[in-house]
Amino acid sequence: MSKAKLDPGAGVRGAIRGAASHLVLAVVCLSAGAGLAWTVGRRPALDAVTTHGEWVYLRQPGSPDSVRAYGAYPERKDKAPGVIVIHEIFGLTDWEPTVVDRLAKSGYVAIVPDLLSSRFGRSPADPDSGRKLVAQLEPARVTGDLNAAFAYLDSLPAVRKGDIGVIGFCWGGTQSFRYATDNPDLRAAVVCYGQPPDSAALARIRAPILGVYAENDARTDASLPDVAARLKALGKAFTYEIYPGTGHGFLKPGRQGSDGPQVERAWGNILAFFKDKLGG
């Protein structure tokens, strides 16, 4: 897959302009009302919001490879901010589209690309197989596929141009942190229990970053004080919280703490962060 070269001076839009013209709309409309079911902590206020979801295929200029993605839109009269969702190390599962729907119900046009699809066709149903395939992804390919998602959102008439953020979980949290070093046009990044990039790369970050971490996840949390100090020294906006009584991946059903109060508290903080940085 050909990659768009990022030029921090010109910005990603210049580097990947025209990507939207290579978009193939696939187009199975999945929701015209409630969307996919949100399985944890759903609130009545969210249920009242009408959303529409569809599968699309994104393509970068000059490449035969396409990226399968699920997107959802809120029904609103004005333009909305956009959010890219990055899946876990297991590939795209049934859970990530529910995250997209939750964001749409909160007023965002959101999309989750299947980052295995441009190379392997789509994510496998078996988590172990997905993990093995994710391990084979080159960082440049992941960045290119995320650029395609960014360009797609930025081209939509329903999205306020430029008001785009990213959120990732587990491996996706690591990619969210890394993508903030590669895309100077991002307005906000949320890292859910992800590892930071190397110290030199941190200097390239422009977007404010919110970190969501679990108390019982020492392997991931160990570097946080040093990373926070480094980003503060660089003048970067980075805040994080470690949620008590939770384990790695706690925002996903079935993980330690996923049925406790910290899930809704974390989501409240995530949505407040996006509203502050991207607008409502």
What are these model-predicted stretches?
Residues 15-59, 67-68:
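An N-terminal hydrophobic leader/cap segment in hydrolases
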Residues 46-49, 55-155, 250-254:
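Serine-hydrolase catalytic machinery in alpha/beta-hydrolase-like enzymes
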Residues 158-169:
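Alpha/beta-hydrolase fold nucleophile elbow
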Residues 168-172, 176:
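Gly/Ala-rich beta-loop-alpha elbow adjacent to hydrolase catalytic centers
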Residues 185-194:
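A conserved short beta-strand
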Residues 211-213:
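Short beta-strand/loop motif that positions the catalytic acidic residue
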